[in-house]
Every structure is written in structure tokens, then in C-alpha cells.
């Protein structure tokens, strides 16, 4: 459909429907567009536009570029606007106002700051004749398709940095373009509406709604480019903003036949069939060629040229028949088929358009020199420009853009006639589209060649979306015809390459130049530019020729490596070759372009005022509008902007790897370096460059290799997110200043944009010094390592306030230092380290910490130790103070990484432990070490590192190290009240080395840590907070333990779970100060300063520090009430003597602190190792004791006490221990933490002993008595009665007992039973719920079946995780169970007011606990399943080895025997279960007694038979064992013994778990039903 060229461009309100489809469908609308308003779409009221165009470039964001040439563009009124001249006032602009443009620019800048660079890049490349020649190197359409393909591939490559894919671009078109460009589009669309430029979605643009439409249409364009007007809008804008290589507003000119799917249009549209590709003028980003829009500006060239593609889709030929003379310059059917890429390539677009314009103008000038100035700009407005500018552009269908190539191409050669512009008439009015920053300014100056009213037929050719890939720019006048098809194609990139296009050099005006703010005086300016252009032209031309030659020689040989492109309509050269060639060409062209740009810029000054605006916009994608630029943005003056814009564009564009906008392939660093060099050499105006740096440079920095998302960095600009450098980097420099500096550097690196924002104003010169092009300098930004630091940590946050050691209350001041110094290191360390610094740090830290504490329970723990390096929980650095207070200043190990020299010393040792421990603090930064390594590490050293160790490591890596011996005598004496240990430990766990070590120590969860010398032990546990440093105890840090209490409790490390719970619970930090003070008193007590060498000594929990209780309440409660068992009460006596109850491996090893009164062993124990181990053990044991053994009244009391302790100092003081607290989950850890902190103070005042009954369930029994003895031994005694003995034996045997033992019940199970019994006592007799809670007791299967496996078979810890499976299982279970228990304890800590409320409360807690129990059992069930798989693999390996050495029949015997063992075991267990159920029923169901008895008799018979079978199988097993002994090594025989027995054990354990899970679920269902009924 032709678009009638109306001189009356007065239809300012022409349908904004200038979508391509409109173009297609609304010839009449197009008619409305007056010829004069060739660029009318983009034009605003000539007056307003002119004024605007004179000073400000009408910039459109990429999205709006195509859609709207800024008012400036076509202001025929403005004398500067050639169009204005030609069109006269008829180019009434509808739409874009400067305010709108600015708004759009702002938006675009905010969204796509980096786009500016993209544009800059693109303009340079597009300008380069190299690209032009490259694009049109082969006249044949096939060659073009090949180029397109190359572009595609290149784009894909460069897209990596930009993260653009064709699809992405097309999709983004709608999204990204819409946001910023659309508003502009809306305005522009108004102006567009006159011309109904195809592109602006609903160019009607009268309504912003349309603008939005445009954005959405852009996406649709990408899809089908359809005939949706919206698509048009979007397309142009997309084209502008899209990162497509060319994404020029008027890229239509570069239509090649082979535009298969190279461009977005092709990709979005399947219409790649037209293989004619427009090589978008945005060649600078050749990669984005797919996005290139096809725009034929030459009237001369026959539409036929591109008709193949064009024919594809019926193109709406917007044939403005420019009559001429004045507005006759009809824009050639600029089919703007921008494949709009989502990015906001407005800059690109403007650049591209400009190049295109230049080319077109050149051609036009070449046809009509007189007009060429205007034409130049006119042509420049390529797809987008044309879309915007061409009066008939309405037809310029977005579909064209969609088709990126094809659409614009005039689909109908027939329409050519309609365009029927005489060659002479072809003077397309010059349409200049300047897109800078996010603005696209399209200036359409109808070229005066009055005599030659060449009808610029915008054969937008609505080539249906189909012809999208086919740029049918065919409608070219005979004159254009004269230009070879290639010329037309060149024309397409013309402005980009600035061919010597016949006629003024102005045509060469690089995009920036021709793209003045508006068409204002464009002709005049262009001439000014022309000199630059002229100078460049020859160069460009020579470059183009050279490139063409190169392409012809290499790319021109496509047939050599030819293959059919996807549409199979054209042969394309080897894609790889193309990519290489394209990259080379692009790089070369960009360099050339850059140089020429600079030269032109130098020449430009004449037209700088206008050009500068355009240039600036281009160069300042971030500065949405030139004015937006931080530099003399306000001044639209060309000089500043000119310089700045030219320079900035290339580098930023290049740099914009981060920005999708920076789609230009030329974004490679090398290219940028070259650009920089070129710019530097040319002496680009640095001022402008700096200014560009403000926005673009920031991006370029990012591009440099820092790929922070452009938008976020912008947003963050103000925010100095301090990303701590990696621990490795900062480990050496532990100074706060270093950390801060690093943070700043890292932040800059990571958020170069932000920094740039600041920089442009503040230090733009810094980056700019490199030259605008050198924005690429970003590579010089701080090394990536720092960025890693940045990313890794924020110094502010990472430094949690050191856990306020209760004892070290004076220490809180350290918080600031500590935090800063620690910056990533655990502040807890600081606590132990130099007390004074720590105190300081603590003071500062707390404020920062608060954030972290809340966020991470682990961080809270970190305060204690395990938590993150920060002391988030209470931000109280007091724990550290505690250390300080303690005579021992050695705590340095606890000090943050960046600490004083003393701290450094400690750190040196601590680093080891830290690495072992891996606290969130420093540990996070430092490379993590394996748990084993950590375990191996000396606890003393480990402490500091433990502090660093992240909780994650502690939790995740916590391996029960069974034989963790208190390497140092400094281990906290197990004697210390568990409450203290636990509390402190929890705190320690998070932050303090101990806390962190807890997990690590867990491995050696030897409470014994007997090596801990009492002296050191106390200081380490300055309350939960200190716990972090605790690990250092042994070294100087333990001593620093607050001497406040002679009893420097060296607390044994509690189980990792404890640590976890501590982490979970703010307990770590809860008593940071108070807890730590009291705790460290208590800790000593707890640790009992047993001789370091005496792990066995019974821990004498000292009741001294009540605060210990708080600490323990936090950690203990969370871990297990039992651990808190040693209540804050000075006398923890209620707790059974810490006869360490060691439960066999699986069984919980419980250590009851018998010496509750044991005054805090004043001897400060070296807590380093013992603390870690003890903490681990304590944690684990606590959970176990809590669940299983805390059932004892004393244990219950312990529960209550811990809870109370943490909640209230008074509780700690009181023998809260007495009130049994059922262990419950410690959900309210943080709140507790706070409470405990408060209470900690009280606790500090109130000494109390918390005995700690630690039950550790694991195959290895960790005896975490308050005693330092570490009974990692997996002592699995069936009876709790045996536990004491076992514990004793364990202490002696240590790890000797690691045999297969029956599954031990989890602490949570025991806790639940205890809670159930308590609740039943409160219920009235006969209550339904009581019946549910007291299910009938069945005899254990062990009474019916025994010897299912040999319990004497040693565990194979090394071989199977399963070996420790029970242990591991129990550990994991205990950790979770302990945490849950803690919550319950806390809740139960306070007695209920009324019986009814009490019952309801207990019932709720019981149900919650039951749910937790089920979850825990299921988790264990899953673990057993994994163990079974591992064991089966072991059996398969043995079978495979045996099969290699024996006959198949013998090997089959082995397999048969293995299967038989599994079957008989399952059978015996099943029969025993049924027997137990039957006999249990006999007692209750008397009426069915007869039937039940007969059933029981039958089962006995079956059982006897099964026993006989079992004995037969065992005999066969002996023969199998003999077979193995003959053929396999002793180790393999041992493996077999283990395998066969483990198989039976796992079957038994799995059945036991299944039964318990089923029963628990039934009980839960019954309870729920009963409660519902009772409530009713």
C-alpha cells in the first residue's frame, strides 16, 4: 500500500497507528502524512521541535527512536531542520515534547544506563565504512544473507557479554524497550502519528497508551512484526534500543536479500525466507545485525531489488511522494524493520540511524546533492528514523521491524512504482535520527531539491511480517538504481559507513553528527559535519572498499564454505568463518570508525551545537538525554557533547558487556582498548568523555569485565555496598582500613555504574581520563578478586556485633573495630582477642550486627562462634568485652581477622581453626577446609578459624570426630555446667572459635578436651558471643576468658547440633555479654577446669554463672534441655552425676554433670580443643539427654532452667533446673537471644551451675560430660542403665567401642515420651487423650528374636558413612531435635498459670513435638535407606571380586546366602512384631482371647521354623566365609563380615523406624481428632 506523501504534514495527529500494519492497512493515514513530514512521525510541532531540536536532540530511547523522531527531527519550522525547510510548517509534530523526551531519556537511562555505551559502540561501528562495505561487501543478496548470518553469530557471541539472544532481543524489545522508550514513543508517536511511522506502536502515539503499546508491540514485532501499529512503534524503538547489531532507526536501507533470520526481525518472523538482509547500519554491533532494520531510502533503487523479501510480505510502501520540492523529499520507503532488541539501544539506533541517514543522504545527495544535507539526515533516519520520520512511514510497519529486514523492504516492487519516485525526486528529505542516551532524535529535513520532488516512498512495504527478513528496499529511484543493489545495501548502512555517498561529506556525518538534537539546521550542521564527514568519507570509503575487498576475498567466498541458511533460500558461508571474519572486520571497522569519529568530532565542532546534542545522546545512553549527562548535560552545545558523545559511544558500547544494550559485538575489550587508543590519539574532548563516563563510562567500567547488572548498580550507586573481598585477600590484611578500602574498591568494581554515577560528577575524569572510549578502563578497576570480596560480603553487615560476652561487658566497645577489622571475620574472635579492641569493635558492631543477627540464626551463633563472621544476633560485642575483661588478653584468636598484632598472632593460630571451623565470619572468606582437616587442626588454632568457620560448615560438615581428643589441655572441662557450656558454646559455636569449632569439634566431640588447661578455657567462653573466640581458648584466648569467675569454664564443645541450635537460636548472642560473663564463669565451672589431661574427670558443672544458664538456655535449650539440665541453679545436683552416660554409638551418650555444685573450676581450662569438642558433644548430648535422659526430673528441671535462664536471669538464679522442661524446638531463638542478652546481665550477677547431660546419639558415643573426657567412642549400650558404665568405659576406651549396636531411640523420642507422661498426669483419668498418649506397650522384638547379627562387628567409619550412620543419623537428628526441643523448653520454661491452660499449652507443645519427632524419624529413615544402598554396594563389590576368583556356582552361593540373610531377618522381625502385638492384645481383648491365643501359637510355630532356617543359613554362612577366606584378602573378609551383619542391622533398624513412624502418625491423627472434638 502506498503511503501517500502529503505535503500537509499537518496531520500532526495522524494516526499513531503508524505501525507497519497501519502502514499496510492505512494508506489513507499514510496519505495524511504529508510528504513534507517525511519524518513527521518523529517530528514535533515544527516550532517546538525546532527549538528543541536546536538545543536538544530529540532523543528517543531505542524503543522510541524508530517510532519517534524527536520533535527536533523534522521540525520543518526550525530553519535548521532540512525537513523543516522542505516540509515547511506542514511537518506538524504530534507527539514528542522535549519534556517527554527527557522523561523517556531518564527512564531509559535508569533502565538501561548502559545502552548509551551500546549506542556509542554501535554508532562507531555503524559509521565505519568497514561495516558498510562489510555488510554490502557482496552485492548479491545471498552475500547479504551470509552477512546476516555472520551478524547473527557475531551477535550471539557478543551477546554473551550482553546476554542477548535474538529471541531475547525480540522479547526484550517489547519489554525493555517499552519501559523507557515507550513513554517517549507515546510522545513521539504523536509526532509519528502524522507520518504514522510504521514503528511507533500505534504511532497514533497521540496517546501514551499507544506508546506503551509500542513497547508491547515491539515484542509482537519481534514475533511477527505483523501489521500491528504497536509493533511498528516498538520496532523502531526496539531497533533503537535493541542490542541488535544495527538496530538503527533506519536500518532498512541495509536490506540484503539474505536476511534470513539474522535480524531479530528474521528471527522473530519466520520470514527469514527473504534472505535479503538489511545489514543494519548498526554494524558496530554486527552481532546485532539480526536486529537490523531494513530500510530502503533510495528511491532510485528498484524495489525489485529487495522485492524478493519484500514480496514476502506485502509491504506497505510508504511512498511519500514527495512532490518535492519543499516537502517532496519523500522518505524513501524506509522500511524500518528493526528487529528491536529489548535493550534500549536508542543510542545505537540514533547512531545507526544516523549512519544510515548519512548513507541515504549520501546517496540522495549523490542523486540530489542540493538535498543531500537534509537527505543525509533523512536517510540517516533509518528504520526507526524512517518509521518516525517518513510521512508515509505509518505504513512503515512494525511488522517491518519485526521483519527487521523484510518488512521495511518494500515488499512490492510494484509499490515501487507507487513510490515511483523519479531518481531525482528521490531526494529523500533528510531524516536524521539521533539517538543518544536513550533518546532518538530524528530530524527529517525535506531536502530542498524542490525541483526534485522525489517521492520518498517509504515503502515500508508493509511487507507482512513475512517479509521481515527480506529487506525490500527495492523502491529506489532510477538514480538509486544507478547505485548497484549493493549500493542500496550500502545505503542501508550508509550512515553507518558513511560511504562517500555522492554528495556532501555531511552525509558522512557520523551518527552523532547528523543526529543533531533535531533536524534543526541539520543541513547546515550536516555541512559542518560534512567537512568531518567529507574528510572521513574518503577514509570511510577506502575502509569500506578495503573491507569489501576483504569480505569478497574471504566472506565473498561463501560458496567455498557455503551451506544453505535455515530458510534454505540462500547459501551462506561457513558460519565459523563468517564469525571470525565478522569479528575481525568489526574490530577493524570499529577502530576505523572510532578514529574517523574522533576526526569527525574534531571537525564537527562546527555543527557541534546540534551534533553535540545528538552525539551526546548517543554517547550517553545512561544519560538518557544529553542534558541528563552529569557533564555539561545541560548544555546541548555540540562542542562538549559532541566530543563527549563521540568518544563515549564506542567504549561504552563496547564495555556494555553487562548491558544487554551493549549488544555490539565490538564490545570486546581489545576493540575497546583500540578505541581508547584511537580516542586518546585523537585527543577526543576529555571533558565530554568524562561526562560520558558519568553514565556510559560507568557502564563501560562494568563492561570492562565487571558485569554488574546495569540497572542494579545504578540503583546501588548511592549505596556503597561493601563487598568484602575474599577472605584470602583480606586475611593477610586484617586492618579495618584495609577492609574498608577493599570494600570500597570492590563496591566500585561490582557497581561500577553506581560509582560511575558518583564519579561522573565527582571523578568522572578518573575514568574518563582513559578517554571516553576508554571507559573501557573499567578493566583497570579493582581486580576481580576484590569484586569477589564485594560480592562475598558487605563489610557493614558481615561484621556482626561481637557477641557481648557477659563477662566482658566492658568489651562491647570493640564491636566497631571488631566488625570492621573482622569485616568478614567472626567478631567473636575479636572478643577473645585483644579485649580492648574487641570491646571497641563490639561497640561499633552491634549496630551493624543487628541486621545480620536477625537474618541469620547462624549469624547469631556466629556471635557465639559458628554464626557468620558477623555477630548479627545482638550486635552486642560484649562477649568480646568479656574476653577483654578477662585477664587473658590472648583472646586475639577470637578477634576479627583484622585485628591488632596480638590478634594477628591469635589469628595465625586461629586461622587454622577458623579454616577448620569455618565460621560465617572469616571462615566464609577463607577457603574452607574439610571437616577432617578442621578436626585435625589443633583446637587452639582451630578456635580462631572456627570462628571464621561459617555455620554452614559447622552444621553441614560437622562430622562427629569420634576420637577428638582434647588435644589441648585447654578443653573446657566437661565439668563446667552444661548450661554454661551449651550457652557459651552455642554462642561460641556461631562466632567464637569454639562455637564454630563446635561442629568441627563435634568430630572430636570429646568433652574431655582434657588437654584444655583451665586457664585458657574460661576466657574463650565469654558468653555466647565469646563462644566465637572460645576455640582460641587454648592459646591466649582461653586465658582471656574472663577471670571474672575464677572458674574459667572451659566448656566442652557441644555437638554440632548444639552449634546449629545455637546458630538457630540467638542464644549464641543472647547472653552475649551477660551470658558470656556468667557463662565464662560458669563455663569454667562447666568445663570444671578439669586438668587438661583429664578428660575422664567428671565434669563438675559449677552453678556459678547463672548467665551460663542463659547461654545454655539459648544453646542448651535449643540443643537440649538436658544440656541445660545443669540448670542455672548453682547446684545442678538434680542432674545425675555427670556419670557420663554414654549411649552406644547409636544410643545417645549422655553425660550428666554430677558435680552441679562443682564450683566453676577456677582453673581456666584451655578450652580451645576441649571447648570445640565439648561443645560438639554437649550439643549432641544435650539434645539426646534432653530428649531421652532429660526425662529425669532433674533433666526436666534442666530443661526448664535453660529456658528460663535464657529468658530471665532470675530463672538462671533460681534452681530452674528443678522444673523439668520438656525439650522443645527452639524456634524463638532470636527473641530468646535478645532476652538472654538482657538476662545475661542478670546472669552475670547470678552464678549458677548448669549441669549438662549430654546425650549423643550416634554409633560413636560422644561423651560430653561436663567432664573434659571425650567419649567419642561409639558406645552403644542397649540400656540407659549401662550408660554410666559405658560412659566410664568409653572414657577409657574412647573410640574402642564402635561395634554394631541396635538402633537407639532419638532424644526427641525420649523427650516426647516424657512430655506425654507429664501431660497424662495432668489429664483426668479415663480421658480419651490419655489413652492415646499411653498406647499399649508391646514387648520389644528383642524378646522374641535375638542374634540377628553379630553386635561385636566393629563399625567401619572409614568405609561407610553408614558406619557412622547411626552416629551421623543421630547427630543430624539430634541437631534438629535439639533445636526443636529448645523451643519447647523455652515455652515450657514458664509454668502455666492454670491447669486448663497448662494442659492446653502442653498439648499444643506435645503435638508440635510429635510432628517434629515424625520428621526426625523420617529423616533417619532416609539416612538408613542411604546406608542400605551403601552397604549393598559394598556387597556387590565383594561379589564381583569373588566372582573373579571362584566358579560361578560358588559365586552364586554367595549371592544366595546374602539374599537369604536379608529374607530371614525380615521374616523373624515380622513374626516377632506380630507376636508382640498378639500377646499385647491378649491382655486387653479378653473376648477374643481364644482366637488370639491360637494365633499366638501359630506365630510361635512359625518363629521356631524361622529360627531353624536362620541356623541353617548361618551354617551356610560359615562355608561362605571359608570360601571368602580362601579367595579374598583378610580385609575383604572383614568387609564381608561387616557387610552381612550390617545388612541385618539395617533391616532391623528400618523396620523399627517404620513401626515408630506409623505409630507416631496414628497417634498424631488421634490426638488431632480428639482435640478437635474437645474444642467442639
UniProtKB/Swiss-Prot annotation:
Region F-actin binding region required for planar polarity and cortical localization, residue ranges: 445-920
Cell membrane in keyword set: yes
Matches recorded under Pfam families: ASD2
Annotated ranges, domain ASD2: 1305-1572
Region named Disordered: 1-31, 46-100, 112-142, 187-244, 267-434, 589-609, 621-660, 699-728, 743-823, 849-876, 910-939, 1036-1055, 1091-1116, 1210-1244
Family statement drawn from the similarity comment of this UniProt entry: Belongs to the shroom family.
Record text on subunit structure and interactions: Monomer or homodimer. Interacts with Rok.
Protein's name according to its UniProt entry: Protein Shroom
Species assigned in the record: Drosophila melanogaster (Fruit fly)
Lineage: Eukaryota, Metazoa, Ecdysozoa, Arthropoda, Hexapoda
Gene: Shrm
